[in-house]
UniProtKB/Swiss-Prot annotation:
Required cofactor(s): Ca(2+); Mg(2+)
Pfam family, one: DUF5874
The protein, known as: Exolysin
Domains as described in the record: The C-terminus displays the cell wall degrading activity.
Biased composition (Basic and acidic residues): 258-275
Segments passing through the bilayer: 37-57
Positions with biased composition (Pro residues): 278-312
Organism the protein comes from: Paramecium bursaria Chlorella virus 1
Function per UniProt: During viral entry, involved in the degradation of the host cell wall at the site of attachment.
Region listing for Catalytic, in residue ranges: 407-649
Any Gene Ontology biological process: symbiont entry into host cell via disruption of host cell envelope
Gene Ontology terms, MF aspect: lyase activity
GO cellular component: membrane; virion component
Entry membrane topology: Single-pass membrane protein
C-alpha cells in the first residue's frame, strides 16, 4: 500500500490573537492545552484509519472489476495513483478542519478563563469566541468544498482509468484476434505441409514395399535354385558314395582274400621268412645268429671288406678272396647284409646255433607236426609278428647266445627282476675314422626296457679298456633313452632347443683333469654321466643340471676323472629314477669300480607317458675337434655282463 502523507497546517493568526497564541505556548498552566493535544492525536489516528479503510475498499472494488492480466496491470497502476491522491486530500482537509476547530475551542476556553480573572474584557472574549465560531464554519465549508473537488477529481481519474482499461482491453482483444488469425494461417500452412509430407511418405512407402516384394521374390527364387542345386549335388554325391562303397567292398573282399593267402603263405614259408635270432631283444632281443663271439668282422661287399685289424687269419665264416681280403664265405652259406656276415636265408641257409646249415630250421625254431619251422617255446622263444624273439612276458631274456629265464641280483640299491641283456664278450672296434662324419665304424646295440622298469632302472655292465686306449678325445659308451610311446625321441646329436623330444643318460669317457676345481689338462682316464633333457624339463632343472649347450651336459667329471683302469675290466652301474610329475625328485646314480655318487633334484619327465624306453650302446669317439680327430688310433673296447634290473633306491 502507498505511503500516506499527513501534512499538519498550523494557524498562526486568528484576528490578531497573537497574545492569545503566545499565552497558549508560554509557561502558564497548560492543563487545557494538553487535553487538546490528545484530542488532536486521536483525530489524526481516526483520520488515518478512515483513509486506510477507504483505500482498502477501493482496492477491493478495483479487484472486482479486473478481468484479465493486461486489464489488471493497467488498473492496478492507475488505481494506486488515484487512491494515494484522494487519501492525501481527504486527510489534509479533515486535519485542517479539526485543527482549526480545536484551536478555536482552545482559544474560546482560554478567553473565558482570562475574562474570569480579569485579564481581558468580556467583549474581547466574546469576540474571540465569535471569531472561532466563524472560522469553524468557514473551515467546515472549505472542507466540504475540498471534499467535493476531490470527489470530482476522483471520478474523473476513475473515468480515465476505466477508459484506459477499456482501450487496453480493446487492444488486447485486437491483438488476440490478430494472433488467432495468424495462428490459424500458420496452422493451415503447417497442415498443408504435413499433408504434402504424408503424401510423399505414402508414395515412398508404396515404392519401398514394391521393391521389397520384388527383392523377396528374387531371393525366394534364388533359394529355390540353390536348394534344387544342392538336392541335385546331394543325389550325385549319394550315387558317387554308393559307387565308391561298392568299389571298396570289392577291394575289401580282395584284401581279405590276399591277407588270407598271405597268412597261408607265411605259414607254409615260415622257415624262409623268419629272421635268425639277432642279439637284440626288440622288444626283447631277436635271436639273430652271430658268426663269431669275438670282434665283429669288418668286410665290405664291394670291392670287398678290408681285413679287420688283429690276427692275420680271417674271422669265422670268412675266407680270403683272390686279392687276399677277408670276405663272407658263400660255401658256408654266409653272405654280407651291409653290416656283417649272416646266414644266406634267401637261399635256404639257416642258423642252427653253431653254423649256417642248408634246409634246417633257424636257431630257436623247431618243426611242428606239419613239418613247418615255428618258434620253439621250450627255448623261451615266441613269435612277435615279425620274427622269433625271447618271450619276455613270461620271464625269458636274451643273454647274448640264447633266451634264458630271468634271475635275481644287481647293485646300486635294492633291485629285482634282473635281466641279462648280454653275457658274452663283444668288441666295439674304434678304428681311426670312427668319429661321426669321418667314415669308419661305430658299435650299436639296442634293447627294450620292460614296462616294470620304465620308471626306475639300474643298468650294469663290464667294460674293458686296452692299454693304448686314448682318452684325449671324448666318446660315448651307452645308457638309457627316454621318450613317449611310438616315438624314438631326439636326445643326442647336438639337438638344438625346440627339437629335443626325448631324454638320455649315457656314460661318456674323457681325459679332462682338474686341480682345485679348475680344468688343467686332458691326461686323465675317466668316465662320467652325459645327459640330455627334453624341452619341457630342461628349463626346470636346478642350475648345475640345466643343459646350456646343444651337445649335451656332463656332470661328475672332476670326481671320476681318473676312475678307469687300463688293460683291465671295469664295472659300471648307472641308475635312473623318474620324478613325480611336477616335482624335482628324480635321481641319477653313477658307480665306477665301487666309487659311487648320486644326484638328486632331477626332473626327468613332465608327462606320465614319458619314461625309460631303451638301453642303447652306441659306442664311438665324439667330443673333440681339429687335430685331435687325426690322433684317434685304431683301438677298441669290450663289453660283457650287460644287465638291467628294477631299481628301488
Amino acid at each position: 500500500m502507498a505511503d500516506v502523507e499527513v501534512p499538519i497546517n498550523v494557524i498562526t493568526e486568528i484576528n490578531n490573537l497573537n497574545e492569545l497564541n503566545n499565552v497558549n505556548t508560554g509557561n502558564e498552566a497548560s492543563g487545557g492545552i494538553s487535553r487538546w493535544l490528545i484530542y488532536t492525536i486521536i483525530v489524526l489516528v481516526v483520520a488515518a484509519v478512515v483513509g486506510l479503510v477507504i483505500f482498502i475498499v477501493k482496492k477491493v472494488n478495483n479487484k472486482k472489476r479486473e478481468s484479465g492480466q493486461i486489464i489488471q496491470e493497467v488498473s492496478q497502476v492507475l488505481t494506486e495513483n488515484v487512491d494515494k491522491k484522494v487519501a492525501n486530500d481527504l486527510l489534509d482537509v479533515a486535519l485542517r478542519a479539526r485543527t482549526e476547530q480545536a484551536q478555536l475551542e482552545a482559544n474560546s476556553a482560554t478567553s473565558v478563563q482570562l475574562a474570569a480573572v480579569g485579564k481581558i474584557s468580556q467583549s474581547d472574549a466574546d469576540m474571540a469566541i465569535k471569531s472561532a465560531a466563524d472560522a469553524k464554519i468557514k473551515a467546515e465549508q472549505a472542507n466540504i468544498e475540498a471534499a467535493k473537488a476531490i470527489e470530482n477529481i476522483r471520478k474523473q481519474e476513475l473515468d480515465n482509468a476505466n477508459k484506459a482499461v477499456a482501450m487496453a482491453t480493446t487492444a488486447a482483444a485486437a491483438i488476440s484476434a490478430t494472433y488467432q488469425d495468424k495462428s490459424k494461417d500458420i496452422i493451415d500452412n503447417k497442415l498443408r505441409e504435413a499433408e504434402e509430407t504424408y503424401k510423399q511418405v505414402v508414395q515412398q512407402r508404396q515404392l519401398a514395399e514394391k521393391e521389397y516384394n520384388a527383392s523377396l521374390a528374387t531371393r525366394r527364387q534364388a533359394e529355390r535354385n540353390v536348394y534344387n542345386k544342392k538336392v541335385t549335388e546331394a543325389n550325385e554325391t549319394i550315387k558317387s558314395v554308393k559307387k565308391t562303397e561298392d568299389v571298396l567292398k570289392v577291394l575289401d573282399d580282395k584284401i581279405k582274400q590276399a591277407k588270407k593267402a598271405t597268412d597261408d603263405f607265411k605259414k607254409k614259408k615260415q622257415a624262409d621268412k623268419n629272421k635268425p635270432p639277432a642279439s637284440k631283444p626288440s622288444p626283447g632281443p631277436k635271436p639273430a645268429p652271430k658268426p663269431s663271439p669275438g670282434p665283429k668282422p669288418a668286410p665290405k661287399p664291394s670291392p670287398g671288406p678290408k681285413p679287420s685289424p688283429g690276427p692275420s687269419a680271417c674271422p669265422q665264416f670268412q675266407t680270403r678272396d683272390s686279392k687276399g681280403q677277408c670276405v663272407c664265405d658263400p660255401r658256408q652259406g654266409v653272405t654280407w647284409d651291409g653290416k656283417s656276415c649272416v646266414c644266406d636265408m634267401k637261399n635256404g641257409w639257416n642258423w642252427d646255433g653253431k653254423k649256417c646249415v642248408k634246409g634246417a630250421c633257424p636257431q630257436f625254431q623247431t618243426r611242428d607236426s606239419k613239418g613247418q619251422c615255428v618258434c620253439d617255446p621250450k627255448q623261451g622263444v615266441t613269435w612277435d609278428g615279425k620274427g622269433c624273439v625271447c618271450d619276455m612276458k613270461n620271464g625269458w631274456n636274451w643273454d647274448g647266445k640264447k633266451c634264458v629265464k630271468s634271475g635275481g641280483g644287481g647293485g646300486g640299491g635294492n633291485v629285482s627282476g634282473t635281466i641279462t641283456l648280454m653275457s658274452n664278450e663283444e668288441t666295439a672296434v674304434l678304428n681311426k675314422g670312427t668319429y661321426p662324419g669321418q667314415g669308419g665304424k661305430r658299435y650299436n646295440r639296442q634293447w627294450n626296457v620292460p614296462g616294470n622298469m620304465s620308471d626306475s632302472c639300474l643298468l650294469e655292465f663290464d667294460i674293458f679298456f686296452p692299454s693304448n686306449f686314448w682318452f684325449g678325445c671324448q666318446g660315448k659308451i651307452g645308457g638309457f633313452f627316454l621318450s613317449r610311446p611310438g616315438q624314438r625321441g631326439v636326445a643326442s646329436g647336438c639337438a638344438k632347443p625346440g627339437k629335443r623330444t626325448g631324454a638320455s643318460y649315457r656314460v661318456m669317457w674323457g681325459g679332462t683333469t682338474y686341480k682345485n676345481g679348475k680344468r688343467v689338462g686332458r691326461d686323465g682316464s675317466g668316465v662320467y654321466p652325459y645327459l640330455y633333457f627334453d624341452d619341457s624339463t630342461n628349463s626346470k632343472q636346478i642350475p648345475k643340471l640345466k643343459q646350456v649347450e646343444d651337445c649335451g651336459h656332463s656332470i661328475m667329471v672332476e670326481e671320476f676323472s681318473r676312475s678307469i683302469k687300463r688293460n683291465a675290466w671295469n664295472n659300471i652301474k648307472i641308475g635312473l629314477k623318474l620324478n613325480t610329475i611336477g616335482q624335482r625328485n628324480g635321481l641319477i646314480y653313477f658307480e665306477v669300480n665301487g666309487q659311487k655318487q648320486t644326484q638328486d633334484q632331477v626332473m626327468w619327465t613332465s608327462s606320465s607317458d614319458f619314461n625309460i624306453k631303451y638301453v642303447i650302446f652306441g659306442t664311438f669317439y665324439g667330443g673333440c675337434t681339429g687335430q685331435n680327430i687325426n690322433q684317434i688310433p685304431n683301438t677298441f673296447v669290450k663289453y660283457k655282463n650287460v644287465k638291467i634290473s628294477k631299481w628301488s633306491p
